[in-house]
C-alpha cells in the first residue's frame, strides 16, 4: 500500500495512512508468497475473465479435483467448516460456534494439497495446469470486534488466502444467511470491520481482495439505532432481547452495499432465492453510484434450484449474472453435498451388491481418466513416486525400499491416457 493510489486501489478509501500501516508492520519483512500470488491472480481474473466460478471445498482432495476439472478459484466456506471440518472436531450449525482458527487451518490444508500436487507434476515435467488457484475464505462476522477481525484476517493471509469476506451480522448471534433470527450491526460497525481487514492486509503487505457481504435483504433485527444511516429502516419496535426491528429487503441491502463500496473490492448481497430481477436491481443501484464496482453472488445450495428455474435458465444463470457485474460466483456448500451424496450412493450400492457396487464406482473413475481424473491411481495421486524420488536423491540411487515399484497399482492400473485437458491460469 502506497500513498499514491494505483489502479488496484482505485475507489478504495482508507481512514489511515501508508505510514500508519508501515509503523505497525515491524522491522522484519515477512513475505506471504501464497497469499500474494493468490490475491494478484484473483484480481487479474476478475478483470480479464467473464466470470470467476468457484466451488466450496472442505478437503484438500476436493480442491485438487476442482482445479483438475478446470475451475479457477476455490471457496472456503464457514458453513462447511462448521458442519464437518473444524479444529474442534465437532459438527456445528453455521452460527460461529467453531474455534476461530478453523477456517485458516482449512485454507492451509487446501494450499498444502495444491502445493503437493504441483510438486508431483513439476517433478514429472507436467506444466499444463496452474494448481495454485486463489482461495477465497469466509471470515463470517469477524468472531468479535475490530481487533478480532484484524487478527482473523492476518491468520487467513498467513494461511495463504487470496481473498476474505466479512458479513454485517452481529458476531455473537451470527446465523447462516438462509436461517432466521439474523441481527445486523450498525452500518458504521460493519465498515470498521472492513477497515480492520484492509489494515491487516496492508500491515502484512499483501493486496488481499476484501469482499463485503450484507445480510440486510433478510435480516430484520439491528443491534443499535445510533447510526443515522440505519434510521430510515427502523420500525420503532424492539425485540424481547432489546434489538431494534428494521425493514428487511432489497432497499436495505442496497443501502448497505453503497455504504460498504468504498471499503471493499467486491460487494455481495446474500439473497433468499435465485432472482435475476432482484440481482439486476441491486447491481444497477450499486453501479449508478460506483460504476464498474465488482459484485459477488452466492449460488447457494439452500435454494431449491429446480423449483425456482427451468433447465435453460439454470444453464444461462452464470453468464447472465456475469453480464450484470457479478464477476465472482460460487456454490458455498458444494463440497459438503458432494461428499455426503457420493458416500451415501456408494454405501447403498455396497449394501445391495457387495464388491460389484464398489467396482462400479471404480469403473466410473477409470471412465473419467480421459477428462483428466487421476485419483483412481491413489498411490500416485498422493505422491508415492515423489517421495521415492526424495529417497533416491538422499541415497544417491542406492536403496531397495522404493514404494511404487512392485505396487499393485503399477501392476494392475495401467492406462493409455496421458493427461487431461489443458487449463492454464494466468
Predicted segments with their positions:
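N-terminal phosphate-binding or glycine-rich loops at protein starts, especially the Walker A/P-loop
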Residues: 50
Amino acid at each position: 500500500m502506497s500513498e499514491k493510489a494505483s489502479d488496484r486501489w482505485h475507489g478504495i478509501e482508507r481512514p489511515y495512512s501508508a505510514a500508519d500501516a508501515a509503523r505497525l508492520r515491524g522491522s522484519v519483512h515477512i513475505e506471504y508468497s501464497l497469499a500474494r500470488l493468490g490475491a494478484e491472480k484473483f484480481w487479474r481474473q476478475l478483470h480479464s475473465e467473464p466470470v470467476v466460478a468457484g466451488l466450496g471445498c472442505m478437503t484438500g482432495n476436493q480442491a485438487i479435483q476442482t482445479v483438475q476439472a478446470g475451475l479457477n478459484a476455490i471457496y472456503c466456506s464457514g458453513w462447511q467448516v462448521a458442519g464437518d471440518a473444524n479444529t474442534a472436531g465437532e459438527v456445528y450449525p453455521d452460527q460461529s460456534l467453531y474455534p476461530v482458527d478453523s477456517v485458516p487451518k482449512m485454507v492451509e490444508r487446501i494450499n498444502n494439497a495444491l502445493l503437493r500436487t504441483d510438486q508431483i507434476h513439476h517433478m514429472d515435467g507436467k506444466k499444463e495446469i496452474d494448481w495454485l488457484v486463489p482461495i477465497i475464505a469466509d471470515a463470517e462476522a469477524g468472531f468479535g470486534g475490530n481487533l478480532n477481525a484484524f487478527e482473523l484476517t492476518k491468520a487467513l493471509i498467513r494461511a495463504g488466502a487470496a481473498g476474505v469476506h466479512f458479513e454485517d451480522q452481529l458476531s455473537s448471534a451470527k446465523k447462516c444467511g438462509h436461517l432466521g433470527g439474523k441481527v445486523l450491526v450498525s452500518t458504521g460497525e460493519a465498515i470498521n470491520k472492513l477497515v480492520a481487514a484492509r489494515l491487516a492486509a496492508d500491515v502484512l503487505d499483501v493486496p488481499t481482495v476484501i469482499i463485503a457481504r450484507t445480510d440486510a435483504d433478510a435480516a430484520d433485527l439491528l443491534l443499535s439505532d445510533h447510526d443515522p444511516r440505519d434510521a430510515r429502516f427502523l420500525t420503532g419496535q424492539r425485540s424481547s432481547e432489546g434489538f431494534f426491528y428494521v425493514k428487511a429487503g432489497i432497499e436495505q441491502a442496497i443501502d448497505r452495499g453503497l455504504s460498504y463500496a468504498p471499503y471493499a473490492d467486491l460487494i455481495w448481497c446474500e439473497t433468499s432465492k435465485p432472482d435475476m430481477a432482484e440481482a439486476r436491481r441491486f447491481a444497477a443501484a450499486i453501479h449508478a453510484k460506483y460504476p464498474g464496482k465488482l459484485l459477488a453472488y452466492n449460488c447457494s445450495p439452500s435454494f431449491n434450484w429446480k423449483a425456482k428455474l427451468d433447465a435453460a435458465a439454470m444453464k444461462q444463470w452464470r453468464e447472465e449474472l456475469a453480464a450484470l457485474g457479478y464477476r465472482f460466483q460460487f456454490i458455498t456448500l458444494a463440497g459438503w453435498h458432494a461428499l455426503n451424496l457420493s458416500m451415501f450412493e456408494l454405501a447403498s450400492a455396497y449394501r445391495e451388491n457387495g464388491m460389484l457396487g464398489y467396482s462400479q464406482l471404480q469403473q466410473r473413475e477409470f471412465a473419467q481418466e480421459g477428462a483428466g481424473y487421476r485419483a483412481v491411481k491413489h498411490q500416485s495421486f498422493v505422491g508415492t513416486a515423489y517421495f521415492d524420488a526424495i529417497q533416491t536423491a538422499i541415497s544417491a540411487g542406492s536403496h531397495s525400499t522404493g514404494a511404487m515399484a512392485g505396487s499393485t497399482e503399477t501392476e494392475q492400473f495401467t492406462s493409455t491416457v496421458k493427461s487431461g485437458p489443458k487449463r492454464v491460469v494466468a
